Amino acid sequence: MSSAFKFGELSVSIFGESHGKAIGVVIDGLPGGTKIDFDAVLDFMARRAPKKDGTSTMRNEKDFPNVVSGMVDGVLTGTPLCAVIQNTDQHSADYKSVSYLARPGHADYTGYVRYNGSNDLRGGGHFSGRITAPLVFAGAVASQILESNGITTGAHILSIMNASDERYDPVNVNAEQLKQVRNRYLPLINASVEQQMRDIISSASANLDSVGGVIEYAAVGLPAGIGSPMFDGIENRISQIVFGVPAVKGIEFGAGFDVADMFGSQNNDEFCIENGEIRTRTNNHGGILGGITSGMPIIFRVAMKPTPSISRPQQTVDYTTMTEETLAIKGRHDPCIVPRAVPCIESAANLAILSYLI
């Protein structure tokens, strides 16, 4: 499987399966001599952990990254950084009755065809959201390196169904605002919508269903001039890694699809001078023009599909016997993956941005 990417000097390779012994990541190209706050890494990863309030899976994994190379006494050595996370709370028996039933919304069937029937189906195998744990470790390390270069990143839940948070101010969002939501139970700018979101998730769960949502990301402190045109633009790199997060189905930068309903005079961001720096008065371009940063905040949003594992009966097929079947999924699943996916989206984008700086 190609669960790896290489952009410039940075390469990241993720390994393991949801119900295997362990999962992990190898990161090459990180700058030697960089001090990493390991407690801060653990705090970052804890944001991805299941909540104990009915909004996420009951699977309980400690997700402690055992660093086996590339770091000594909290300092990066410059050689490949490898971290391994043990899987300790698998319930593989939940999947025996559905081994060859194509779960709607999952990659069981496509993986079976792609890998000639050899893919690990337990818990989704390598296609599982479980595999984002090592991605978030890598993203946590990247976040610290970015911050040491004056770049602050963050994300929040923009919406779950019809419950919507405020958007980041695309022109004036700042580092302090990005940091404020990081440790909130649900990462929201406007905490008053939290209960509405909880009610939507609880209702879906009670109805044996699930819901999706939208996550918004921002990065501030990037200078103008980072990126490349056409096929290696900063949007391209961000999108490629973001789509490695299971459940992501769409991405838009700046004003996104709204630009299709604008005149050029509305969409164009006029330039100005502020405190001796070139800026734009608006930021419909999301901080990127021609694949290159403009110096304005990078802003993008991603659409997360509802968790496909639901307990409602669904029609499917057994792809080994070629018969139609009825499927009722058992096990422990998130009625809404969006809250736990916020640090995953941050991690993906952080790594993409970091790839231009090393």
Model-found features: residue ranges?
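Generic N-terminal targeting/processing segments that precede catalytic cores or assembly contacts
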Residues: 1-358
